[in-house]
């Protein structure tokens, strides 16, 4: 495999390069064509003849495969291209980031925004809390400062989402291209999942009543009650 890159130059420079490639080798050797980079490896200078142009090394949003042929019939892959050297006019501004927004073809215009999945907006404090609780569970401890009402509300939202996804699942797979055997398997699977969700929802309602009964007793504080409730829920999930 070779190491290759895309060289994008202004129209005036591309015309000069085309003339150099079309001329004889002896004439083209007299005109220097070189590229220099600074210490950071991202900014450099493109030289053609006595003229210098600023250049930047950018990362493409997708990998482009490069092929070559000797007989105009068989293609041989030579490299995976993921970077581009953009040569610009001396007065043009430099790019703000090293990640180029667009691809090489018109369908890949603004690919990083239109085709890439956005990073989830997570609260750093929530992430640290989940990591800390996970380490406590793995070490044999319990989750701290858990509100049962908070857990109950989020579990209800989760069930609603699962119910909607099951509806989409049925409408997507129960089509004429699906065999009767697969339809039967799908119905059995959905019935088992629905039965499990209803049983889990009934258990949560029972645990809510159990928590209210345990809080009334004076010998148990709120933290001990939450720990007992979570232990019962974990045992049910494992079963």
From Swiss-Prot:
Induction: Up-regulated by heat shock.
One of the protein's GO biological processes: transcription initiation at RNA polymerase II promoter
Tissues of expression: Expressed in roots, leaves and inflorescences.
Subcellular location(s) of the protein: Nucleus
GO CC entries: transcription factor TFIID complex
Signal peptide interval: none
Keywords for the protein's UniProt record, in alphabetical order: Activator, Nucleus, Transcription, Transcription regulation
Known function: TAFs are components of the transcription factor IID (TFIID) complex that is essential for mediating regulation of RNA polymerase transcription.
Family membership noted in the UniProt record: Belongs to the TAF7 family.
Subunit structure: Component of the TFIID complex. TFIID is composed of TATA binding protein (TBP) and a number of TBP-associated factors (TAFs) whose MWs range from 14-217 kDa. Interacts with TAF1.
Name of the protein in its database record: Transcription initiation factor TFIID subunit 7
Gene that encodes the chain: TAF7
